[in-house]
Structures are given as C-alpha cells and as structure tokens.
C-alpha cells in the first residue's frame, strides 16, 4: 500500500513537471529587461487564449499592487496561421504564474533585433542584377522574365520604406508600424532593400507590389516582439487581400537565437508567403541567429563581385543560397541612391527572384528548392559545411 502511495506521488510530480512550460533562458546582453514573449501550445482555442490573457492581466495587476512593480503587463497578441502568443512586460512572479499554465508552450526573453547591413561605399558599381541573371560573372546586363513579379506582393519588414521614391511609383503602400509613430524610413535601410527586391531601376521583381512594414527604428534596432507583430500583420493582410500563395516577405534583420522568431517566420511560410532572410554579418555559424536559423525559410549568405564569400557573412549548414551582398547600389530616401554591403543586401536579391518565380507559377512552398536546383556552384571559400551555390534567376544566360 505504501509503495502504491509513493508511486502515485511520483507520477503526480512528473505530471506537474510536464505541465510546466519551457523557459528559453539564454541570457545575453541583447535581452530587453522584464520583457517576454509567451507562446501557446498548438490547439489552444481563441476562447482559451483570451481567457489566459485575462487571467495573466489579473495576476499582473495583483502582483503590481502587492510589490509596487513598474512593469506594464500584456502588450500585443499575435495569431500567425494558428500560432498564438503575446508579448509583455512582467515581473518574475507573473512569469512564474504563466509558466505554470498548461496552455503555455514556452516563454522566452524579448531581445534587441538589428539590421544586417554594414558599410557605405560611394560610387560603387551596380553588379548584383547582372550576376543573378548570368551563369558567368562579369555581365552588366540584367536579363529577366517579362512578368517580373507582376501580381505578387512583397512585404518589406524593415526600417520602413520611402513610399514616395520614384523607384516604387504606383506599386507601393504603407502597411504598419510596430516600433514608433514615425511612418517614414529615417534610416534608409528599408528603402535600399526594397529597391533591390522590387525597384524599377535597381530591383529584381520590377513589377511586384510592395508593402512597407516598419519594425526597426531610424537607429536600426527593434525587438523580437516587434518583428513578430509585423509578421503577424503581413499574414493577416495577405489573407484579407487574397494574396496568400502570391506573396513574399523580406527580412534583412536578425538577432541572437529566438525560438519565437523562428516559429513566426515558419508559420508565415506555411501560410503561403515566401520568406527570405539575411544570414547575418558576424562571420559565424548562422545556426546561432534568428530568424536565419529557421529551417523553413530561405536563408541568404552574401557574396562579392568575385564570387567569394563576403568576409562578414555568416555561414553554416542552415544557409540555403548565396546572393550578391557586397557593395550593392540601390534606392535611398528622398529619391536618391546609396551603396551598402551586408547579408541585408543578399536577402532582397533572393526575395526578388522568389517573387519572379511565383509570378511564373512556382508555388511558394517550392521556391527555395527551385532556387537551389538551378543555382550556380561557384562560390569559393563558402565556409565550413556551407553550400557554394549562387543565386540564379534561370534566364538562360
């Protein structure tokens, strides 16, 4: 009898441990103090989700009254193709309560997310378009299918885009802003990447429609939660406009590893949006960066005009493809141009080619695989365990 009682107690203890959500506590100097992302288990209904939020808000308010905490509580909720969660500013007692809710899958620290661009080089040549449309290097002509991404919507999730720039005339609209109240591109990074994926002069998919989604400030930084909120908005917008299956999303940004960030981009891809992501500029294995380390998306490393890995580019088995990223000329706010280098510049080349492929009938689910099938195996010194395949648009040149 005593043995049965001990076993029962043991099983109850195991059940209690299993019910507790996992806490991704990786630490690091990019952690935003007292800010968290909470992800619910698959299958949690909308009603249960709202009930959980109400309970968390009540617990937070109670703890705030007891301890005089200055935390703000629940901020934003997201639902990306059935992947539900939220972010907020909580004290430790409230987080303990959240972790013990059996509807919660995991909790992680919110973190700073930054641009994946590097330096400006004035008067550099434009070479990326010629490179992705020819099997041999050195060609300056850009050869592409006349559909040029027509009928496809590209979401530029970045620092915003100068929607009045002549490069985008008649094909762009402002989407949303998750970082501040300034609906402009005060940094220039987002305008540059948009110019590469869909600009009239400097772009790959010259006829694609563009949506500006601002998740990073003029200083080039934001948060994981802000990026997730932006992705959530993109999926909702694409669904409302019947664009799922005819959409692409460029993320020329990143931070340290985040399961929530990876899950968000995975759900966007599964919903019917082709997601291109910058590998990062730390010259390290991209498996340690997010959203670059999400297996479901198309992760782009950066190459030079000489078909060599850019010195700054991340590498590793998670890399899907190389694309031009060193000294890329593109649009700048105010109607001008500028030259930037980074995996931020490689990703929009991939995004633009992806949009062009979708316009030609390739399914969103197959775009990245198709790119890898026709890519040129020419990159020298790609990095340990890294593909040597360079982006090619299949023009036949």
UniProtKB/Swiss-Prot annotation:
Residues 20-116 form a propeptide. GO terms for molecular function: serine-type endopeptidase activity. The active site is at 158 (charge relay system), 189 (charge relay system), 344 (charge relay system). Glycans are attached at residues 250, 393. GO terms for biological process: proteolysis. It comes from the Eukaryota. It holds the Pfam family Inhibitor_I9. Residues 126-397 form the Peptidase S8 domain. Its main location: secreted. CDD domains: Peptidases_S8_PCSK9_ProteinaseK_like (cd04077). The keyword RNA-binding does not apply. It is found in: Secreted. Residues 35-116 form the Inhibitor I9 domain. One of its GO terms (cellular component) is extracellular region. Its EC number is 3.4.21.-. InterPro entries: PCSK9_ProteinaseK-like, Peptidase_S8/S53_dom, Peptidase_S8/S53_dom_sf, Peptidase_S8_Ser-AS, Peptidase_S8_subtilisin-like, Peptidase_S8_subtilisin-rel, S8pro/Inhibitor_I9, S8pro/Inhibitor_I9_sf. Residues 1-19 form the signal peptide. Keywords: Glycoprotein, Hydrolase, Protease, Secreted, Serine protease, Signal, Virulence, Zymogen. Secreted subtilisin-like serine protease with keratinolytic activity that contributes to pathogenicity. Belongs to the peptidase S8 family. This is Subtilisin-like protease 3. The lineage of its organism: Eukaryota, Fungi, Dikarya, Ascomycota, Pezizomycotina.
